[in-house]
Regions:
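Internal, charge-rich low-complexity segments
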Residues: 93-104, 170-172
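Core segments of transmembrane alpha-helices
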Residues: 14-22, 78-92, 128-131, 153-165
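Membrane-embedded alpha-helical segments that form the functional core of polytopic membrane enzymes
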Residues: 17-72, 87-95, 108-123, 182-199
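Membrane-proximal helix-loop-helix units in multi-pass membrane proteins
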Residues: 109, 124-126, 131, 135-140
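Membrane interfacial helix-start motif at the N-side
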Residues: 1-10, 61, 65-76
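C-terminal membrane-associated helical module and adjoining short loops/tails
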Residues: 1-19, 28, 39-53, 136-224
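Membrane-water interface at transmembrane helix exits
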Residues: 64, 90-93, 134, 138, ...
C-alpha cells in the first residue's frame, strides 16, 4: 500500500524530469542554423514531451482510482503541468523557431512553430491570473478544482506541442511544392484553437473567484 500511495507522486516528479530533459534538448535547436542543429533534436524532444504528457494523464488517474490523493500531489501536479506547458510555449515562441527567410521577405508568418510572442503573453497571463485567484479562494477553504474547459485546455496543449514539433520536422515551408503545405494550416488551426481555449478556460475562474470573494467579504459592522 505504501508503494502504491507514492506511485502517483513519483509520476508527477518524473514529469518534471522529462520537462527538464525536453528543455535541455530544445536548447540545442535553432531553425536553419549554421551549422545545422543535430537531426535527432526534434524527434527526441517530441518523445520526451509525449512521455511527460503521459505521466500527467496517469498520476491523477491512479491517485483517484487508488484513493491516494495527497496534498503534495495537489500542489506539485499543477506546478509540473505549468512548468512543462509554459516552458514549451515559451520555447516554441522564441527566436529558435524564427524563419529568417520569412522575416527577410516581410511575411507575417515568421514562426515555423506557428506560436508567436503575443500568444505566449496570453497563455502566461491566463496562468498567472488563475493561479492567483485559486490561491486566494482555496486559502479560505473553498474548493477551486479545474473545470471541464480547463481540462480540455490541458488536452489541447498536450496535443498541439508534439504536433507543432512534427510539422517543424517535416518543414512544409522549405519547399512549398512538396505537398505538405496543408500541414502548416493544420498547425495554425490547432495553435489558435489552443490559445482561444486557454483564454476562455480562465473566464470561469474569474467569475467563480468574484462570487467567492463576495461571499468571503466581511459584513459591515452593525449589520443584522
Amino acid at each position: 500500500m505504501f508503494a502504491r500511495k507514492n506511485i502517483p507522486n513519483q509520476l508527477t516528479m518524473l514529469r518534471l524530469v522529462f520537462a527538464a530533459a525536453f528543455f535541455g534538448v530544445l536548447q540545442l535547436y535553432r531553425y536553419q542554423a549554421e551549422p545545422a542543429s543535430p537531426v535527432w533534436v526534434l524527434p527526441v524532444a517530441t518523445v520526451l514531451f509525449i512521455l511527460a504528457a503521459i505521466t500527467d494523464a496517469l498520476d491523477g488517474y491512479l491517485a483517484r482510482r487508488w484513493e491516494v490523493v495527497s496534498k503534495f500531489g495537489r500542489i506539485m501536479d499543477p506546478f509540473c503541468d505549468k512548468i512543462l506547458i509554459l516552458g514549451a510555449v515559451i520555447y516554441l515562441g522564441s527566436p529558435r523557431f524564427l524563419d529568417p527567410v520569412a522575416v527577410a521577405d516581410g511575411s507575417f508568418r515568421t514562426m515555423v512553430s506557428g506560436v508567436y510572442p503575443w500568444m505566449v503573453v496570453l497563455v502566461l497571463a491566463r496562468e498567472l491570473l488563475v493561479t492567483g485567484i485559486r490561491g486566494e479562494v482555496e486559502k479560505a477553504g473553498i474548493d477551486f478544482s479545474a473545470n471541464w474547459i480547463g481540462k480540455l485546455k490541458m488536452i489541447l496543449q498536450s496535443v498541439v506541442v508534439p504536433v507543432v514539433l512534427v510539422v517543424v520536422m517535416i518543414d512544409p515551408n522549405r519547399d512549398p511544392g512538396n505537398g505538405y503545405a496543408w500541414l502548416g494550416w493544420v498547425r495554425d488551426v490547432l495553435v489558435y484553437a489552443t490559445v482561444i481555449a486557454t483564454v476562455l478556460s480562465g473566464l470561469p475562474y474569474v467569475t467563480g473567484g468574484i462570487r467567492a470573494f463576495k461571499r468571503l467579504k466581511p459584513e459591515p459592522e452593525g449589520s443584522a
